[in-house]
């Protein structure tokens, strides 16, 4: 069984928001997952959809996997990881000379596909 990965590093969305969508597609076939994400209203669904398409493209590239091209119907999402990335820290001035910290969070999205034969 072959493993194909795709990454989106430093995605400008918090990991918590993407994990909600990632839990929906974990364990699905790649074509079903893309159909599911197409109708999700969350912004994280668009980002995850692009990463899955990239992983499918890696699986269909014959140069990367010794001359074989895998069909999208035979690919299963076995690994979806959404980890926290670096934070941009900003200062927001408040009353009486105080300042509040604003944390603009980012995330690293990783998708792993596995080829299943005879589906």
Curated annotation (Swiss-Prot):
Keywords: Ribonucleoprotein, Ribosomal protein, RNA-binding, rRNA-binding. The keyword RNA-binding applies. One of its GO terms (molecular function) is rRNA binding. Gene3D superfamilies: Ribosomal protein L22/L17 (3.90.470.10). CDD domains: Ribosomal_L22. Pfam families: Ribosomal_L22. One of its GO terms (biological process) is translation. GO terms for cellular component: cytosolic large ribosomal subunit. The keyword Ribonucleoprotein applies. It comes from the Bacteria. This protein binds specifically to 23S rRNA; its binding is stimulated by other ribosomal proteins, e.g. L4, L17, and L20. It is important during the early stages of 50S assembly. It makes multiple contacts with different domains of the 23S rRNA in the assembled 50S subunit and ribosome. Part of the 50S ribosomal subunit. Belongs to the universal ribosomal protein uL22 family. This is Large ribosomal subunit protein uL22.
